[in-house]
Amino acid sequence: MIIGFDAKRANANFTGLGNYSRFMVDTMATYGDEHKYRMYIPKQCKNASYDSLLKHKNVSSILPRSSVMKRFRALWRTFFIKRGLLQDGVQLYHGLSNELPVGIHRTGIRSVVTIHDLIFLRYPQYYHRLDRIIYNRKFNYACRKADRIVAVSECTKRDIVCLLYTSPSPRDMRRS
């Protein structure tokens, strides 16, 4: 199986989301060595921890292919990455940091999203209004369209059900 990852945070983030993303890819590549893993990143950042993932023979890093998409990386990651996923034969896509590409459910590619927290809904006073609107749309969309949802804690799982009104069934919701 070919598994694609939204690896933006694995490459560009050196704390929580980045550590989680790198851990997931490393663990999957180590114990699921019969599969191939594609890490999709909007741009290459200098990151030795990310680069060490490429030592696995079954892991590769994918950047936007066209010069236009290299300039409009956010659009590529949100809307246009699907074309590359299909060209690369990806069968499962994991949004490691709360997001999925728009329309992925129409591609035939199964999807998983990891939700880390909904702190922007719990404590909205600490977030700009526009950021809350964007996060709310992205998180809601991902939870509605994903084949599986991974909640990083029981608290996050409860928040997903309570604040995003997403039932744990019929799609499974797992706590990592």
Question: Where are the model-predicted features located?
Answer:
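Carbohydrate transferase catalytic cores enriched for Leloir-type hexosyltransferases
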Residues: 1-167
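Single conserved hydrophobic/aromatic residue that forms the stacking wall/gate
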Residues: 165-176
